[in-house]
Swiss-Prot record:
This is Intermediate filament protein B. One of its GO terms (biological process) is nuclear pore localization. Residues 446-470 are annotated as: Disordered. Residues 434-589 are annotated as: Tail. Residues 131-268 are annotated as: Coil 1B. A and B can form homopolymers. Giant body muscle cells. It comes from the Eukaryota. Signal peptide: none annotated. Belongs to the intermediate filament family. Residues 269-285 are annotated as: Linker 12. Residues 117-130 are annotated as: Linker 1. The keyword Transcription regulation does not apply.
């Protein structure tokens, strides 16, 4: 078969730069069972050759039937090969027509190439002159960009260090603040314990005072009883003296009666001496009996009176002595009790004075700690504001530097592209292949990059940034916490946790750009509660007059806006107690 007998098939296509008109010759020949078809160009520029070779077999020594079959197969193969050759010849003709069209296009391209070659030297020199300065400027800008990038890296590193330091300071302030809070809580607990102990001592002091009053009353009562006992003693002493006088009188009367009786006895004896003996004896006996009876009676009466007087006197004396001893004992006990109570009262008064002094010191220390805490809070807020301002400034600088760096990178990329294109153009000057396409690419790329560069420059140079900084300060518990940038309201805050502040007749003064000044006087008896805020709205700015939370300034419809605004709080004495400063700076590239 043709597939088994075909040994080789070869196509060769060669391209040369010289293009000339050519003629095509189509030949067909048969030699020893081989077919050859070729296209020969007059100039030898393009050659298309197809070679088909077939082997022949010896037919000697075979039978007639086999030779007839072989001849038939050979003829069928020959017819098939003829048809294939016809198809191949048709395809070759189509290829030749296509080659003619391509040669026509090549002639046009050769003309364009000649035209470009005529302009090559002029355009190359102009491009070289045009881009030499740009390349030099680009290299300089690249160097400047690298130097500025290094400076930016140094600034960023320094700002990172500053940020780390501020973070450490913030953590330190936070730690100290927590420590101060713990100390304040401890002092508050100590104050509460001291106050409870003080209340207990005051109750004890009141109890001792009442006990002292009761003892003073008992002492006065006992003193009155003692005075009464002394008066009774004096009366009893006078009575004893009176009774002694009576006894003396009775003794004298008894002595007088005894003398009278003796006189009477003598007289009776004289009478008896004159009377008869019996009568004298009788009267003598009777008289002796009567005298003895009278004497016995008087002795009994005197003895009984004496015993009664002595017993009554001893009883009264013992009663008076017992009362006096009892009064002395009670008086000494009361004196000791009063002395002890006075000592206790003195000790309690000393302890009370010490506790009051300690309480005053603790309250003063708590007040100082509150002031220090407020100062630390203000310093912390100022540090936070400074940090925020620094971060905003750093972000703005970074954004500006990034924009400049992006512009430099865009310029560098544009210059790198132009350098690459310029290098290709210089390299293509020798080969002169595709010059027109490269020139068109240069023109299009340059126009596109110039447009992009213009947009980038417009974006960078059209950027305007606004930086606003706030600064607050206060000399007490009231601060100006917020000032609306649009001039709607001003907010005052009492930072103390337990102390109210009277802001009556205080003045708010707002100075705009060192020109206009707005002054508002707070109504009398306006009290800002501890830990609360007060908003003062301008007229028609949405505020409702609800003291002390919100006030409305009817004198102005705005607090004013400006680039440099200073708001101050001034008390009745004209002292500045708080300030709020707002500065706005606009920067543009």
């Amino acid at each position: 078969s043709l597939k088994q007998s075909q040994e080789s098939s070869e196509y060769e296509i060669a391209y040369r730069s010289t293009i000339q008109p050519r003629t095509a010759v189509r030949t067909q020949s048969r030699q020893s069972g081989a077919y050859s078809t070729g296209a020969v160009s007059g100039g030898g520029g393009r050659v298309l050759k197809m070679v088909t070779e077939m082997g022949s077999a010896s037919i000697g020594g075979i039978s007639p039937a086999l030779s007839a079959n072989a001849a038939k197969s050979f003829l069928e193969a020959t017819d098939k090969e003829k048809k294939e050759m016809q198809g191949l010849n048709d395809r070759l003709g189509n290829y030749i027509d296509r080659v003619k069209k391509l040669e026509e296009q090549n002639r046009k391209l050769v003309a364009d190439l000649d035209e470009l070659r005529g302009r090559w030297g002029k355009d190359t020199s102009e491009i070289k002159i045009q881009y030499s300065d740009s390349l030099r400027d680009a290299r300089k800008e690249i160097d400047d960009g690298a130097r500025r990038k290094a400076e930016i890296d140094v600034k960023v590193a320094r700002l990172r260090d500053d940020l780390a330091e501020l973070r450490n300071r913030y953590e330190d302030v936070q730690h100290r603040r927590e420590s101060d809070r713990e100390k304040i809580n401890q002092w508050q607990h100590a104050i509460e314990d001291a106050q409870s102990e003080l209340e207990m001592l005051r109750a004890r002091w009141r109890q001792l005072t009442e006990e002292e009053k009761r003892l003073n009353g008992d002492n006065a009562r006992i003193w009155e009883e003692l005075q009464k006992a002394r008066n009774d003693l004096d009366e009893e002493t006078l009575g004893r003296i009176d009774f002694q006088n009576q006894v003396q009188t009775l003794m004298e009367e008894l002595e007088f009666l005894r003398r009278v009786h003796e006189q009477e006895v003598k007289e009776l004896q004289a009478l008896l001496a004159q009377a008869p003996a019996d009568t004298r004896e009788f009267f003598k006996n009777e008289l002796a009996l009567a005298i003895r009876d009278i004497k016995d009676e008087y002795d009994y009466i005197a003895k009984q009176g004496k015993q009664d007087m002595e017993s009554w006197y001893k009883l009264k004396v013992s009663e008076v002595q017992g009362s006096a001893n009892r009064a002395n004992m009670e008086s000494s006990y009361q004196r000791e009790e009063v002395k002890r109570m006075r000592d206790n009262i003195g000790d309690l008064r000393g302890k009370l004075g010490d506790l009051e002094a300690k309480n005053a010191l603790l309250e003063k220390e708590v007040q100082n700690l509150n002031y220090q805490l407020n100062d630390d809070q203000r310093q912390y807020e100022a540090a936070l504001n400074d940090r925020d301002a620094t971060l905003r400034r750093m972000r703005e600088e970074c954004q500006t530097l990034v924009a400049e760096l992006q512009a430099l990178l865009d310029t560098k990329q544009m210059l790198d592209a132009e350098i690459a294109i310029y290098r290709k153009m210089l390299e293509g000057e020798e080969s002169r292949v595709g010059l027109r396409q490269m020139v068109e690419q240069v023109v299009k790329t340059h126009s596109l990059q110039q447009q992009e560069d213009t947009d980038s420059t417009r974006n960078v140079r059209g950027e305007v940034s606004t930086k606003t900084t706030f600064q607050r300060s206060a000399k007490g518990n009231v601060t100006i916490s917020e000032c609306d940038p649009n001039g709607k309201f001003i907010t005052l805050e009492n930072t103390h946790r337990s102390k109210d502040e009277n802001l009556g007749e205080h003045r708010l003064k707002r100075k705009l750009d060192n020109r206009r000044e707005i002054v508002y006087t707070i109504p009398p008896n306006t009290v800002l509660k501890a830990g609360r805020t007060m908003k003062i709205y301008a007229r028609d700015q949405g505020g409702i007059h609800n003291p002390p939370d919100t006030l409305v300034f009817d004198g102005e419809n705005t607090w004013g806006i400006g680039a440099n605004v200073v708001t101050s709080l001034i008390n009745k004495d004209g002292d500045e107690r708080a300030t709020h400063t707002q500065k706005t700076i606009q920067t543009g590239q």
